[in-house]
Amino acid sequence: MQRRSFLRRTGLALGAGAVLPSLSFTSPSNVSLDSWANVRSQFLLDPKRIHMAQMFLASHPKPVRDAIDHHRKMFDESPVEYWEHNWKTMEPEMCKAAANYIQADPTEVALTDSTTMGLGLLYTGFQLKEGDDILSTTHDHYATDKSLEYAAAKNKATIRRVTLYKEASNATADEMVGTLTKAIQPNTKLVAVTWVHSVSGMKLPIRTIADAIKSINSNRSDQDRIYFCVDGVHGFGVEDVTMADLGCDFFAASTHKWIFGPRGTGILWGRKDAWNKVVPTIPAFSYPAYGMWLGMIPQGKLNFCDLHSPGGFHSFENRWALKEAFDFHMQIGKKKVADRTHQLGSMLKEGLRGVNHIKLHTPVSTELSSGINCFEVEGMTSEEAIKKLSTKKIIGSAAPYPISYARLTPSIINNEEEVKMCIAALEKIKE
């Protein structure tokens, strides 16, 4: 189908003589990211503050800012022309960049606005029947809990939540995997977990869980197969792993946290042999999906990207700048990002362990922790501790859970001196 024929059918064809704006944004390639100081220089973060909560909502590095500014300018100059010239190619380019980052097929990646949107689309669209069992945990975020509740109510399924550990700091991988797999029942069709618990900093051994579920599935028919779904947001952008490494069936994450991507962006990845388990909730506006509806493309099976990226008009200047965030990470190197994040996190945890009035809840081992570090200050609530730190220009966060711990999350924008200043401030926080 020709693009102009498609646009005539949608009421958006322009005059034959229209001069269309520049097709795309080209990010400068001469920026050196060979030192952590150079990496930090790419951000407009206030240097008078120590930013230890980028995992909540990140600042944009220069390549992402420049791309957003470019797209915004072009939309403001001629919105319809710029959209017409780019709409068919830009979202597939973003999926391609995400797929390159996770070493997956671009057709397996759908674009979302957030982890919450991804989880909502996944779980409420998951094909369950009355009596099916959903197994989850007591450590998941509100977004997972509510999405699963809506899915259960919609399908008359049941939900069970198991506690994998009482205290994260001394939990073991064997204990957690054993507890979860022992809770699987014959009618369990969906296992939903969170990779890194933002309430405690615990990082689950996703691959080990995936292998255990695969073993159980080997004795089941396809109809009774268990599907393994992961809220991966707080490992995504930290850990040097691929989707093949994790071994799950579905993976949801936002890209405006550890990825430092445009605000209001995210991905939902689905393994090819699991696509048919999820029914779309929001119609896609992809070129193939819309073209089939118009009768201008032969009917056929749509891939996950084309079918499950929600349609409608988005904040295009942000969505179309997502590639630059993934490119930024890849230019630094995924392993370097992972090593640096763990280095600073380990330094912080070791320092906090030596403070008498601090209780560290996050495991010290990097096998069971990622970039989130959760702790309590004796005699203070998490909000009080974070507020006190803010008087020292240290920006942290309080975990938004019924039981809340204070959190400091150093990332690649931080340095050793800032970590030392955080430890020193916490040593004196009760004075």
For the regions a language model picked out, list residue spans one by one:
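Pyridoxal 5′-phosphate
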Residues: 5-431
